[in-house]
Amino acid sequence: TAYLGQPGDGTSPADRFNDFQNSLTTLVNMPSSNGAQTSVALAAEDLVRSVKGAATTLSTTLNDVNMEIRYEVADLNTALYQLRDLNASGSGFTPGSLEAAQFDEKVDTILDQISGIVDTRIHRSSNGSISLYTVSGAALLEGRVVQDVTFNPSDGTLMAGNQDITPFKDGVRGIQHGSLAGLSELKRE
C-alpha cells in the first residue's frame, strides 16, 4: 500500500478505476453528452497513468530486492570462505592465551554475521574445525569445503552448492530465518 496508495485516498489505482467506472455509468445514462464522453476519456487516461506508475514502482522495488539478495549472498559467501580459512589455519593456540581468544573472537564475529543472513547449526569437530549447516540441514561449510550460495533472480531460487535452500518452497531444505529469508519473502509478495 505504500506504493499503490490506499483505497479512498484519491490517487490509488483502485480509486482511479472507481472514477473510470463511475464515468462509464454516467456515459451509459447520457450517451450523447460531450461532457460524459470527455469524462470517460480523462478517467481512462488517469487510470492508465496510475497503473503504469504502480507497475514502474513495483518493478523498481523488485530490482532493489534482487540486488539486496545478491549483496547478502556475496556477504554470506565471503564469510563462509573466511571461516574456511580459519578452519584451515587451525586454532593450535594454547588454551586461554591471547592468540586463542583473538582467534575465537574472529570465529564468533563471522558466525554472528552468517547467522544474521541465514539460520545456522554449528558442528565443531574434535580438532576444532567448524562445519556449518542451515537449520534444515543443508551444508554451507564442512571443514574446508564451502558450498557456494547462489541466487537466481528470475525464479528466486537460492542454492548452497547443489542443495536448494530457497525459503518457503515445498520439499526443499529451505532457510527459515535471517535476512535472506526476509528478502525472499518480500520478493514473493
Language model features by range: what are they?
Residues T1-E189:
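Structural signature of extracellular appendage/secretion-system components
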